[in-house]
């Protein structure tokens, strides 16, 4: 299960109601920040999530509206005397932006907190314990951008009726079966996992795409996602302008969701030039299971 807290949902210019981009994903005891726009500290506090115990930051790309919150966040963590190592993941170009930004404030090779900078490559898979994060390339103007597939595996659960029928006692022996290993009961009978486990279920797939100028190449990554979060900066009537600035229209985002058999579509990176109702109408005409993200929205998948 993944819990999402939308911290910033604006396009490059923030508004009264929308902060610069940032999204917190919580799952399996992990707290992962996707993008770190200006003002992210206050958004974390206002959301109730807080900014301590962040496990890592994933950056979709290095444009300033997605990374300018990093220095302030790191400075506050230093004041809080955080000893945890912060891992920041992004493309080589994005990591270079972070390095230069930190160097301008604290000097070459220095940072205010323990820091691990991790350049990403397309196809790289990050192990987050209870789930994995597949990193894939995204096209957005002059950047080497990334999208992220969060995948929790389907699991088989113990069937109470089978446990009772086979007289399997409570305790560690049941955990052994749940972990996939056979056990021997006190009376000598051998019980295997196949005897007491149900069919696989419960696996989830969350896909997050930041700024992108095309849906080409994204189909394989979004296919079958329970939830797709993706930008929709323009409407289709302004598709030429969308191309010029390297962004999608709401119609294009919806078409991608429809072709990928996505469960739910959440539109993000919202421009103040359009009423939300108009953006939503364009997308829902193609993919009805669409909503627009707002700051401090919480979703669970």
Swiss-Prot record:
Subunit: Homodimer.
Protein name: Ribonuclease Z
Family named by the database record: Belongs to the RNase Z family.
Binding residues annotated for Zn(2+) 2, in chain numbering: 65-66, 211, 269
GO MF entry, a single one: zinc ion binding
Protein source organism: Bradyrhizobium sp. (strain ORS 278)
Entry annotated with the keyword Zinc: yes
The keyword Methyltransferase is assigned to this record: no
Active-site positions on this chain: 65
Cofactor: Zn(2+)
Domain of life: Bacteria
Note on cofactor: Binds 2 Zn(2+) ions.
Binding site for Zn(2+) 1: 61, 63, 140, 211
EC numbers on record: 3.1.26.11
Protein task: Zinc phosphodiesterase, which displays some tRNA 3'-processing endonuclease activity. Probably involved in tRNA maturation, by removing a 3'-trailer from precursor tRNA.
